[in-house]
Amino acid sequence: MAASDALQSIVYSRGSLRLLDQRKLPLEMEYIDVKSSADGWNAIRDMVVRGAPAIAIAAALALAVEVSDLDFIGTPEEAASFVSKKLEYLVSSRPTAVNLSDAATKLQTLVSKAAETAKDSKSIFQVYIEAAETMLVDDVADNKAIGSHGAVFLQRQLANSKKISVLTHCNTGSLATAGYGTALGVIRALHSGGVLEKAFCTETRPFNQGSRLTAFELVHEKIPATLIADSAAAALMKQGHVQAVIVGADRIAANGDTANKIGTYNLAISAKHHSVQFYVSAPVTSIDLSLPSGDEIVIEERSPKELLNSEGGLGKQVAASGISVWNPAFDVTPANLITAIITEKGVITKTDADGSFDIKGFLLPAK
């Protein structure tokens, strides 16, 4: 069972999981076998797989593979506890992305309820495996809905433009999800509809997800695209080359504040200054209503080597020995800089009354 996109970060069939090692792209395409939750944890932490939706699916499936042939001796309640603890462990691999913790919570609730009526531990694992597999299928469908909603909305908002050029950041395509993509899914939909002039992508330092992954996907699918340095984005907007910026999200607070790849905040400020529309594109699982604002979002800090060495820390040292490093993986873009939030349920726009997002009000009827 796998997504149908030509580029697949996750290749799964029951009892087997292979993850595309995205650290080696675009020069090599190598898949790594994942046979346990420990393998999954390491793959997520080491960024073999990345992207908020993808890591949630990869984590869930890693545990599904582990329990598919597990010789477990215990009651249904003990099996549910085993699954729950493994999921807690997997969540610790990357704390900023809410998709992972959201998926874990849903799966924990599911197996706990199943344990109330299950006759043996094997049936608990079966329930878990089927639920994890459903998440994989649903993610692709949700991504395509995001792309469709986003493309239609952008065309309405930019009706005066015969064709639309957009800028995107990091990687939000089929490599960051189970298939198709979120922000890159919108770009795909615009291209399929014949209204995309060009997609610009940032290199996205220090791990270069834009130059290594997004550029790779765009070239692979023959979408007209241009790669720019992160520091060239403001100049690009000033010269009028883009009408919109579209980014993904790792966590969206109740007020619309959005945590995404470091550098997103810079782009939002530049977009506001140059009157360029700024869109966040993400599944509703990226929304965390328990957080009133982005101030409460935990920001992961990564290894200094990503800045000290070339190739996002994988190459030779390029910085002076002894220099201190601050390397946050994400930043938080305030809601007032965001034009709208594109989800699989539709587009969340700001209220006329005070210009804020009523995300809770949007989600209640959508569920």
UniProtKB/Swiss-Prot annotation:
<keyword id="KW-0413">Isomerase</keyword>
<feature type="active site" description="Proton donor">
    <location>
        <position position="250"/>
    </location>
</feature>
<dbReference type="Pfam" id="PF01008">
    <property type="entry name" value="IF-2B"/>
</dbReference>
<comment type="pathway">
    <text>Amino-acid biosynthesis; L-methionine biosynthesis via salvage pathway; L-methionine from S-methyl-5-thio-alpha-D-ribose 1-phosphate: step 1/6.</text>
</comment>
<dbReference type="GO" id="GO:0005737">
    <property type="term" value="C:cytoplasm"/>
</dbReference>
<dbReference type="InterPro" id="IPR042529">
    <property type="entry name" value="IF_2B-like_C"/>
</dbReference>
<dbReference type="GO" id="GO:0005634">
    <property type="term" value="C:nucleus"/>
</dbReference>
<dbReference type="InterPro" id="IPR027363">
    <property type="entry name" value="M1Pi_N"/>
</dbReference>
<keyword id="KW-0028">Amino-acid biosynthesis</keyword>
<comment type="similarity">
    <text>Belongs to the eIF-2B alpha/beta/delta subunits family. MtnA subfamily.</text>
</comment>
<keyword id="KW-0963">Cytoplasm</keyword>
<dbReference type="GO" id="GO:0046523">
    <property type="term" value="F:S-methyl-5-thioribose-1-phosphate isomerase activity"/>
</dbReference>
<dbReference type="InterPro" id="IPR011559">
    <property type="entry name" value="Initiation_fac_2B_a/b/d"/>
</dbReference>
<protein>
    <recommendedName>
        <fullName>Methylthioribose-1-phosphate isomerase</fullName>
        <ecNumber>5.3.1.23</ecNumber>
    </recommendedName>
</protein>
<keyword id="KW-0539">Nucleus</keyword>
<dbReference type="InterPro" id="IPR037171">
    <property type="entry name" value="NagB/RpiA_transferase-like"/>
</dbReference>
<dbReference type="InterPro" id="IPR005251">
    <property type="entry name" value="IF-M1Pi"/>
</dbReference>
<dbReference type="InterPro" id="IPR000649">
    <property type="entry name" value="IF-2B-related"/>
</dbReference>
<comment type="function">
    <text>Catalyzes the interconversion of methylthioribose-1-phosphate (MTR-1-P) into methylthioribulose-1-phosphate (MTRu-1-P).</text>
</comment>
<keyword id="KW-0486">Methionine biosynthesis</keyword>
<feature type="site" description="Transition state stabilizer">
    <location>
        <position position="170"/>
    </location>
</feature>
<dbReference type="GO" id="GO:0019509">
    <property type="term" value="P:L-methionine salvage from methylthioadenosine"/>
</dbReference>
